[in-house]
Regions:
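Pyridoxal 5′-phosphate
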Residues: 16, 22-295
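N-terminal secretory signal peptides
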Residues: 1-16
Length: 295
């Protein structure tokens, strides 16, 4: 008899201090606001006075961002490539919803959490600069890219250009397709690290043949930090009718770009890296006219 109607009950179950959550998140998003697409996804976040080029010297900005995190008193976290820490606001929200869902799982998950799924997808799409119907939330870059790799209708005579620098999970997925379906893998071996973009592009394009159907590109190579000239390779590939898949695990929310800037057809990333989302979150993007091909 405490609740007059179901809507009152549902409202009480939502994290009670959303305003505090947003205010705390502003410290983290303040750093992200240096990127061009944050304004579209989070219009309430003010633009910082610093530019993306001089923010490294803005002690006040980084002190503000640091205060949003629960840092270890004994360890210095230097590895943000594999997984980044989530800010306190995200951890508190995750703990709240986890406890709430375990009180009555089917009720809370479907009546409450599901209501936020589409707004979240729309915000992520805005951050990535693409229509929401082209993105899907998943668990990480590996799941996103594997969904595409194993879903593409490739035939035994088809060739896929990969690199010796691709992430092991992706390399193994392509090896699986080669063993199961007879897809031919052609390895590019660009001279890395290198500042010669044309040499990197040429290392890929010289592997293109009439049978090449797709080129797999790693946006940032985790071994050495090389930023690959994805757009140049993609343009060269499309000129030959070749599709482009981009592993953006290490670039989303780190480099200042939107997905269309890359000129690719398929793309996947992890959100628990530089976006600092809770562990086990990723994003998959497929160009609208290509979605039907992945099954």
């Amino acid at each position: 008899g405490r609740w007059n109607k179901e809507s009152d009950y549902l409202a009480a179950c939502i994290m009670p201090d959303r305003r505090t959550f947003i205010q705390q998140s502003a410290a983290v998003l303040g750093g992200l606001a240096l990127h061009q697409s944050v304004g579209a996804a989070f219009p309430g976040i003010p633009k910082p006075s610093a530019t993306i080029h001089d923010a490294g010297d803005d002690a006040d900005l980084w002190r503000h961002i640091r205060s949003a995190y629960a840092c270890s008193p004994t360890l210095i976290n230097l590895n943000n490539g594999g997984v980044s820490p989530s800010p306190r606001a995200a951890m508190d929200a995750l703990d709240h919803y986890n406890r709430m869902c375990n009180e009555a799982p089917s009720y809370y998950m479907w009546r409450i959490l599901d209501q936020d799924r589409e707004p979240l997808r729309m915000n992520l799409a805005a951050l990535a600069g693409v229509p929401p119907e082209e993105v899907a939330i998943c668990r990480n870059a590996t799941e996103a890219l594997n969904t595409i790799i194993f879903g593409l209708p490739l035939q035994p005579s088809d060739e896929v250009v990969v690199s010796t620098y691709d992430y092991p999970n992706m390399a193994n997925a392509w090896k699986q397709r080669a063993l199961r379906d007879g897809v031919k893998l052609v390895h590019a071996d660009p001279p890395l690290p290198s500042e010669d973009e044309e040499a990197i592009v040429e290392a890929y394009t010289r592997k293109f043949t009439a049978n090449t159907k797709l080129v797999h590109l790693t946006h940032i190579v985790n071994w050495n930090g090389q930023i690959m000239p994805v757009r140049k390779i993609a343009d060269a590939a499309h000129a030959r009718g070749i599709e482009v898949l981009v592993d953006a695990a290490h670039t989303f929310a780190l480099l200042d770009y939107r997905i269309p800037d890359l000129g690719c057809d398929y793309w996947g990333t992890s959100l628990h890296k530089f976006l600092c989302a809770p562990f086990g979150n990723g994003l998959m993007w497929i160009k609208k006219e290509k979605i039907h091909k992945v099954w």
